[in-house]
């Protein structure tokens, strides 16, 4: 079917808007992609995939790669920045810097929250899902930069966004589930209850959605590759929402 002039104009306008949005996103990230599809994959949640597309077309494989690239680059940064620190001290600093909450903070500072591509999950679930996968998306973007521009480009991104954090005073690492439980006890509330809401994905690569409940409070949900990981995300979401201090461990 031949497109009418009006349809052609709308198509060009839509393409131009998409190009402008990509350019703005690249500017915030600080890397111009030779292959923009890598960036799009890095910000695409599995729920946004059309029928017939593989889970590998979402951010998850890039997240795996980016996680290891981040660990390598930050390890190198720590090795040179703290020449008198022993292996144990370096490991603790590394764990704090690469935890999901740290990655999510970087993603927030870059304004990536609204760039995540999700399927139709409803406004309430949309907001929860965006927050729960923000750290994963940051790692996926690192993976995309690595594939597109190599180690040097990925290292530049990490150094630009992690150097200042590396020199901040360390905070004690605490499990968000422990923080939430202690806060609940201080409020005279019972122990938080975690329940599995949904399990999706194949047996070898499951995704768990878990909710945490406390009387008088709206449930908070988290998503992770294991029940425990999802529980920690859910606890972190409730901690952030209720303004609880002390949840620092990813």
Swiss-Prot record:
GO terms for cellular component: cytosol. Residues 1-15 have a biased composition (Basic residues). Its EC number is 3.1.26.3. Its cofactor is Mg(2+). The active site is at residues 67, 139. GO terms for biological process: mRNA processing; regulation of gene expression; RNA processing; rRNA processing; tRNA processing. PROSITE patterns: DS_RBD (PS50137), RNASE_3_1 (PS00517), RNASE_3_2 (PS50142). The keyword Transcription regulation does not apply. It is found in: Cytoplasm. HAMAP family: RNase_III. This is Ribonuclease 3. It comes from Bradyrhizobium diazoefficiens (strain JCM 10833 / BCRC 13528 / IAM 13628 / NBRC 14792 / USDA 110). The lineage of its organism: Bacteria, Pseudomonadati, Pseudomonadota, Alphaproteobacteria, Hyphomicrobiales. The gene is rnc.
């Amino acid at each position: 079917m031949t497109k009418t002039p009006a349809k052609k104009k709308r198509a060009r306008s839509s393409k131009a808007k998409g190009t402008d949005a990509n350019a703005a996103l690249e500017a915030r990230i600080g890397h111009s992609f030779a292959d923009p599809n890598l960036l799009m994959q890095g910000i695409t949640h599995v729920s946004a995939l059309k029928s017939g597309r593989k889970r590998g077309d979402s951010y998850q494989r890039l997240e795996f790669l980016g996680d290891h690239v981040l660990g390598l680059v930050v390890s190198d940064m720590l090795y040179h920045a703290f020449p008198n620190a022993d292996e144990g001290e370096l490991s603790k600093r590394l764990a704090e810097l690469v935890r999901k909450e740290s990655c999510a903070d970087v993603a927030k500072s870059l304004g990536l929250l609204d760039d995540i591509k999700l399927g139709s999950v409803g406004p309430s679930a949309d907001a929860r899902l965006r927050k729960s996968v923000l750290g994963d998306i940051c790692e996926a973007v690192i993976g995309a930069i690595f594939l597109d521009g190599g180690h040097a480009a990925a290292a530049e991104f990490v150094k630009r966004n992690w150097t200042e954090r590396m020199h901040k005073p360390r905070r004690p690492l605490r499990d968000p589930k422990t923080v939430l439980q202690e806060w609940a006890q201080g409020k005279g509330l019972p122990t938080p209850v975690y329940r599995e809401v949904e399990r999706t994905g194949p047996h070898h690569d499951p995704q768990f959605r878990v909710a945490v409940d406390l009387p008088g409070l709206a449930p908070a949900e988290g998503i992770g590759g294991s029940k425990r990981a999802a529980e920690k995300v859910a606890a972190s979401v409730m901690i952030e929402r209720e303004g609880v201090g002390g949840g620092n461990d990813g």
